Amino acid sequence: ETIEPLFFDADSDGDLDLYTANGGIEFSKFIPYLSDKLYFNDGNGNFTESKLELPTNSIFFNSSTVEASDIDKDGDMDLFIGERLISDSYGVPGSGVILLNNGKGSFKDVTSLNAPELKNIGMITDAIFVDIDNDNDEDLIVIGEFMGINIFFNEKGLFKLSKSELSNYKGWWQSIQSGDFNGDGLLDLVVGNHGLNSRFSASKEFPIRLYVNDFDINDQLDPVLTFKRENGKFYPYDLRHNLIDQMKPLKKVFPDYRSFRSASIEDMFSSDQLDNSLKIDVNILSSSIFINKGNGKFDFHELPQKAQFSPVYSLFLKDFDLDGDLD
């Protein structure tokens, strides 16, 4: 399915063309339905699919977001594409790619040279180009599930991952926008998260943790979502029958619900299995605002309670009440 569309002038002819970032979990990563598409506008609102190969299609990319910026300052719009997940491998980090435009709608993948730290950055849900350090070029901010808020500073077209404190806010982030919310001339961030109205809770002291491994040795990865208790151990969110549906050998370990009811992740799998598992955490679920104080510093504020009732998948900023402030 089309996850995100973007209208931008791909071929520098003065009209808006259309890029569609496509993805989904229904198909193998080798199915062409996952391929992104670029449609050229003839100037009269008629769109024709580009015959040029898009770099993301040759690497079986499961796209989640597309953003445009003139990265190399040559007058045309270049692209960032984020990878939502790797098919059949939930939890395994995806990558972002930087595509430079030749001015005619032909794109080249320059990620390995211009932004190598985008490789395996995480399960990307959204991104934004914004001049967050106020140095007159657009930086790249990337968010996702089990990810921090990752700022890539633009240094003459090369993107360097910052050591910003925002990278420590590990969430199920879904959307991001920027605006000057306090009128100090610096761009701040508002970021949509899972919210606080569900059975899930997370903090730095008691994070949610996802373990990913082929626990039942059947050549398929098994993601197991857990929460931390006061005793320091992690316990599965899923019930016994759900886990057995995923991993049949657990039926012998836990023959009934009584034997399973107090089982921690350490009771389910060996220490070697857990040590060799991919482990990623979430420590914040609130949709939040980060006020830019300059020099890479931000003040954190939760959005009001009504903004926490559900996951925030999209954000739109506008001065609705005409008071000079962004709502």
Regions found by a protein language model. Give the residues of each.
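Blade-edge motifs of beta-propeller repeat domains
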Residues: 1, 37-61, 93, 97-122, ...
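A compositional/structural signature marking long, glycine- and acidic/polar-rich segments
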Residues: 121-184, 188-190
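Beta-propeller blade termini
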Residues: 1-12, 16, 40, 62-73, ...
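Hydrophobic beta-strand segments that make up the repeating blades of beta-propeller
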Residues: 18-22, 79-83, 139-144, 189-193, ...
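Flexible loop/turn segments at secondary-structure boundaries
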Residues: 27, 87-89, 148-150, 196-199, ...
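Active-site lining segments that contact anionic ligands and/or coordinate catalytic metals
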Residues: 146, 173, 186, 205-207, ...
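Secondary-structure-rich domain cores
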Residues: 301-311, 318, 322, 327
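Short, solvent-exposed loop/turn segments at conserved positions within beta-propeller repeat blades
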Residues: 28-34, 88-94, 144-147, 201-206, ...
